[in-house]
Amino acid sequence: MGIAIWLKGMRPQTLPASVAPVVIGAAAAWTSIRQLGVCALTYPAPESCAINRATQTTLESRFWPLAILCALVALFLQIAVNFANDYSDGVRGVDEGRGAASPALPASPASSSSAVPTGTPPAAVVLSGRRDGIAATSIHAPARLVASGVPPKRVLTSAGTAAALACLCGLAIVVITGHWWLLAVGVCCLLAGWCYTGGRHPYGYTGLGELFVFVFFGLVAVLGTQFVLCGTVTATGVLGAVQAGLLSCVLLMVNNLRDVDSDRVHGKRTLAVRLGERRARILAVASYAVAFVPVAVMALSPLVLSALSLVGLPCWWRTSSWVGINASGEQESGSSGGWACALPSPPDTLTWAMAAYGVVCLAIAALTIRALLRRDHARALPLIGLSLLVCAVGYAGLAAI
């Protein structure tokens, strides 16, 4: 077997789901570290200012080594999970017919073009025919290692090697930070990765995959990275964790939507199988929109407000209270109101840069939602991964301002 099949076995389209949350967590941590240097302009300076600056210096000195180690932990864990998933599904027979050299299977009459909605691209057609008793998978389902003839033990060994590399990087993080309880978090991550499709009762076969992905690729990955880098968790980190978790869930949901017919035949009751193809697709689109569209809206809002200010908007009703002395020497009070409008504010370079970022986000969102609605899973998967990376770039950009 050549190296190409091993690279495909790593499932590169899923790797952004591991690296992007680390970038988001690192960006949130960098913002917190910078705020440690802010001190009240009082004399003499409070003692807390000196303590905060010393802490800031320490955190900044080890920021990049720890950030790189966090990224490597996430990357190696994702690769280990992908190999373990390939092994478990392969030995169970779920991936039969998904070898590197497996020919495309002809559609049965039940899945002929007459049953496909007009305008549906070829990528959306899921074959429901059977050959030699094996259920067919979707046309664009990627090849799997075990199904391609790679010995299962070699795939399992590769998963163990990737997991061991993740553990080494994790141990380095523990030694540097002194947070020994992170070892327990690492064990939970390893167990979650293996039990997705491994063991006697894999939770990926019962529709709980998305829940665990939200927890480990969202909350744990983002907030864990932030805590490792700055020793605290902030609202920015929580928001980023929710967004990363939702987008990672959508990535898994689309993957399962692509394989929904094959999974149903093999008894793999993913969330897509439990909900049904239509409802699962609606949930995927809604989750994606909730997680990613607000990023574009927030990026475009400064330009919109700037444009409105140039035409005398936005305006609001302003009420003011007053207290005075009348002619009789008695105190009087009252209130008055009137319209107030924002002063004209031409957009600056930062506003234009954010607007350009927002336009890119809107374009990606439109293409992704279109691909999801048209059942074009081959195009939707990389677009969702790109959305994760673009979201991470946005957080990194805000942290750098």
Where would I find each of the regions flagged by the language model?
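Functional transmembrane core segments of multi-pass inner-membrane proteins
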Residues: 212-260, 266, 278-282
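Acidic (Asp/Glu-rich) catalytic motifs at the cytosolic membrane interface
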Residues: 76-103, 122-129, 134-135, 249-272
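Membrane-embedded alpha-helical segments that form the functional core of polytopic membrane enzymes
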Residues: 22, 35, 58-84, 183-194, ...
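Small-residue-rich segments of transmembrane alpha-helices in multi-pass membrane proteins
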Residues: 21-25, 211-226, 273-277, 382-397
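Multi-pass membrane catalytic core of lipid/isoprenoid biosynthesis enzymes
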Residues: 99-110, 115-176, 272-304, 344-349, ...
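Intramembrane alpha-helical segments
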Residues: 140-232
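Extended hydrophobic alpha-helices typical of membrane-associated regions
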Residues: 300-307, 323, 329, 344-401
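Topogenic membrane-insertion module of multi-pass membrane proteins
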Residues: 1-43, 47-52, 59-65, 69, ...
